[in-house]
Amino acid sequence: FYTRSFTDAEKALSQGKKVLLNPEKEEINGLEGKFVQVFWSPVHFPNQPGTMGIFCDPTHPALADFPTEMHSNWQWWDICKNATIMELDSLKNNMQPIVRMVDNFYKNRNLSLLFEAKAGDGKLLVCSSDLAKSLNTRPVARQLRYSLLKYMESDKFNPQEEVTFKQIKQVLHNVNRTKEEKKSIYE
């Protein structure tokens, strides 16, 4: 079951379904998706939006039909530019993302573009990059979506970590955090 709505995902998970939750990036309370690293040093320019790249396991079955290395490469450009990066620190259960966005050493948060978990009676995959819009002109997003849905249909989709609906909502819509402001590094 693919949805962009947390409410629909919660309902489907309560019914024991497998869900790919792909919220609108504007609805996610996180960091602006960037492909390039932070400029210079976060010590001197601490409020820069951006991360230090991607770290993932290219052999993870969720990425079986999405060619990648364990690090950022050009196929990730569109995925990152059309994403809001999720911060998983509030989960407090050592959640290991499928696709980790590497934070800078100054903040060192647990950042994710893609993670999986058991939720309610179902199984959940959350992707914070837009996998819905303009897929006819975005072959990379189309391929990642295909790979994730194929993974969910398989017996290999068996998340180990468990999260509550409240925790998922916190990651996506935490009212206690605000999006990092987009500032020029020269201000």
Regions found by a protein language model. Give the residues of each.
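Short, well-ordered secondary-structure micro-motifs within conserved domains or adaptor modules
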Residues: 1-38
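A general structural signal for well-ordered secondary-structure junctions
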Residues: 19, 154-158
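Functionally constrained cores in energy, signaling, and assembly domains
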Residues: 10, 22, 116, 124, ...
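Short amphipathic C-terminal alpha-helix that caps PH/PH-like domains
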Residues: 140-153
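Catalytic beta-strand/loop cores that center a nucleophilic Ser/Cys/Thr
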Residues: 25-32, 41-139, 157-187
